[in-house]
Amino acid sequence: MTVGRAESPELVAVLAGRRIAVLTGAGISTDSGIPDYRGPESPPSNPMTIRQFTGDPAFRQRYWARNHVGWRHMDDTLPNAGHRALAALEDAAVVTGVITQNVDLLHTKAGSRNVIDLHGSYARVICLGCGDTTSRAALAERLEALNPGFIERTEAIGGLAVAPDADAVVAETASFRYVDCARCAGMLKPDIVYFGESVPKDVVAAAYRLIDESDTLLVAGSSLTVFSGYRFVRHAAARGIPIAIVNRGDTRGDHLATVKVDGGCSELLALLADELSPLPTH
């Protein structure tokens, strides 16, 4: 059943009185100013693959130059009404937790406590050699020391576009100097699951567990194009629990949905926060 965006009684009816596991994608963050790779109005985008990153020093140089600018914009981004609604529903014991395909940390910023960052976080960096992790802010200090004035020169041009993985469009990257791991001189990479990488098994297991402990699955702002998210819809369907999808445009999981609402996440999640009654916490 598909209902128009202005109607939501069916959505509320499917979710009312149930403990809800939530799966979110890029569509929930567009109202915070972060673009969607695959939304119906998104421009063509070619996200980086892990093979490109590890196999080509020039590609890494270009990537780190762009990320050096882009991560700050991601860090300054604020959650929107959709993120805040899910945090409020968790406080009301309605939402059991959020599985997010986003790396923007906006659920955590909004106050959600049980968040599974399926694809990692823009705010951490990991060494592919020794596995050491550090904050992106600490790496920024090292990069700034090697590239004084780079950010100012880039932002002076104006019209900066930042992708969902904190990759900014920067024209001049050939002079940028990047660094290796301070501990072992290994290759550093943002702690983000890139195209061609697998989500860590323990993270996948935690997401399955969250769905198993819930009475229904709500998908918000994901086209479910990649299997890393779609598998959880299949898992919920195999368990026989209701599935509700809120998204602008079609999704890969529409045929499995109990109810699908074509509309924006901010408005519809805020509506759910108003309509769904708190549940007992025992």
Swiss-Prot record:
Family annotation (SUPFAM superfamilies): DHS-like NAD/FAD-binding domain
Sequence positions that bind Zn(2+): 127, 130, 181, 184
Record GO cellular component, one term: cytoplasm
UniProt cross-references to PROSITE patterns, sorted A to Z: SIRTUIN (PS50305)
Binding-site positions, NAD(+): 25-45, 101-104, 221-223, 247-249, 265
Required cofactor names: Zn(2+)
Catalytic residues, chain numbering: 119 (proton acceptor)
Recorded catalytic activity of this chain's protein: N(6)-acetyl-L-lysyl-[protein] + NAD(+) + H2O = 2''-O-acetyl-ADP-D-ribose + nicotinamide + L-lysyl-[protein]
Keywords: Cytoplasm, Metal-binding, NAD, Transferase, Zinc
Known EC number: 2.3.1.286
Subcellular location: Cytoplasm
GO molecular function: histone deacetylase activity, NAD-dependent; NAD+ binding; zinc ion binding
Domain Deacetylase sirtuin-type: 1-282
Cofactor note text: Binds 1 zinc ion per subunit.
Protein family: Belongs to the sirtuin family. Class II subfamily.
Function recorded in the entry: NAD-dependent protein deacetylase which modulates the activities of several enzymes which are inactive in their acetylated form.
Identification of the protein by name: NAD-dependent protein deacetylase 1
Provenance organism: Mycobacterium avium (strain 104)
